[in-house]
Amino acid sequence: MDTKGSTVTISSSTPPQNCSGNTNFRTNSSSNKSCCHDGQSTGCALQTPQGQGCGSSPCLYRCPHYLIRTYSFHPCLDDGSRCTEGINTHEKETMQILNERLANYLEKVRMLEGENADLEDKIQEACSKALPILCPDYLSYYTTIEELQQKILCTKAENSRLVSQIDNTKLAADDLRANYEAELSLRQLVEADANGLKQILDALTLSKADLEARVQSLTEELLCLKTNHEEEVNSLQCQLGDRINIEVTAAPSVDLNQILQEMRCRYESIMETNRKDVEEWFNTQMEELNQQVVSSSQQQQCCQKDIIELRRTISALEIELQAQHRMRESQECILTETEARYTALLAQIQSLIHNLEAQVADIRSALQRQSQEYEVLLDIKSRLECEIATYRSLLESLDGRLPCNPCATKWEPSCQARAMECFTPVYTSSSLPGIHKPCRASGPPSRILVKICTITKEIKDGKVISSYEHVQPCYITRATKV
């Protein structure tokens, strides 16, 4: 008789190891589940009541959960040979199923080991490829940079030497220009003085010509007066002639030549005195003018010297200002080049950091994924080991419980049972009430169908990506006891 789609509770008479008490599990079974999915081993999902569980000292391994979907018992013949043969057949089937699952598990373990080896090779290859990017060789660039820096320093020294030579040449040219301007100004002053003296000489020449003209006019007037006087005397003498003979006692006659000579001498002395006065006045005026010219020339020379000094100072300051401007421009160029270089270097370092962060994030995600897969596989491995240990213990317990002379017992299965979970292999036995009859030579064996439902869920970032369910049937044949 088979009972399907029911909730079954199995009560165990054998206490579990390292547990404080029985643990009840409640689950629903359905008869339309498939028996297997490509031989994959997964865990199972059960609900545990509150307040019950294992003790403070848990076992090393956690056994899988078992769900008895359907059970039935088949009456055997009365002879013990048929019962033993049926038990051995079911044990062989169970061991064959376990061997198949173990082979699938080992094959999957080998496949995962190969995948892990491939992943390790890929990681090592990626690390070896990433090494040149992380640690580039800059030695050749350093030598080139040092050579270029030496050339730049030599060029800067040559430029500074040329700039100093240019500055010295400019200063010498400024000095020569200042001297030329001073000499030119002196020449202009001398030319102005010469022009003034020429004007004075022209004025004196004109005054001399005027005086000579006056002397000549006076001489001519004197001659005219003399001739007129002689003519008058002659005319008077002619008129008087012999008629009048007058004897006059008078002073001796005056010598006109002497008088003229005296007048000439007097006028010459007057002219000489006038000339001397004019020469003295001219000399005094010339001396005053010369003194003024000398003083003005001295002042002009002092002013020119001051102007030259100021011009030299201005030129020196302009040269220094230009040098400071050039230095500032060179420093600004160096600053811009340094900023550009360090900006590019910073951008490269930031890109390298971003790449490394991306690689680290990828490696972390890969490690997390592999750790999750490893945990899942380790859980599967532990579950499989627990299943194998459980099957072995069940087989050993069944072999130890088989009686030599089994008794025939008529019993009816109950729909209430109790399941137990612990960290050690689970021992289950059916203590089902029934109507006992007198013991016979052999009891009817019971065949129980146990279905192991295992569910594997792949979780990433707290979300279920995929879920797999595996159902493994297992038959357990028992003989009833008296």
Curated annotation (Swiss-Prot):
Residues 1-91 are annotated as: Head. One of its GO terms (molecular function) is structural molecule activity. The keyword Cytoplasm does not apply. One of its GO terms (cellular component) is intermediate filament. Residues 127-137 are annotated as: Linker 1. Residues 91-402 form the IF rod domain. Residues 399-482 are annotated as: Tail. SUPFAM superfamilies: Intermediate filament protein, coiled coil region. Residues 239-254 are annotated as: Linker 12. Residues 92-126 are annotated as: Coil 1A. Residues 255-398 are annotated as: Coil 2. Residues 138-238 are annotated as: Coil 1B. It comes from the Eukaryota. There are two types of cytoskeletal and microfibrillar keratin, I (acidic) and II (neutral to basic) (40-55 and 56-70 kDa, respectively). Belongs to the intermediate filament family. May play a role in late hair differentiation. This is Keratin, type I cytoskeletal 39. The gene is Krt39.
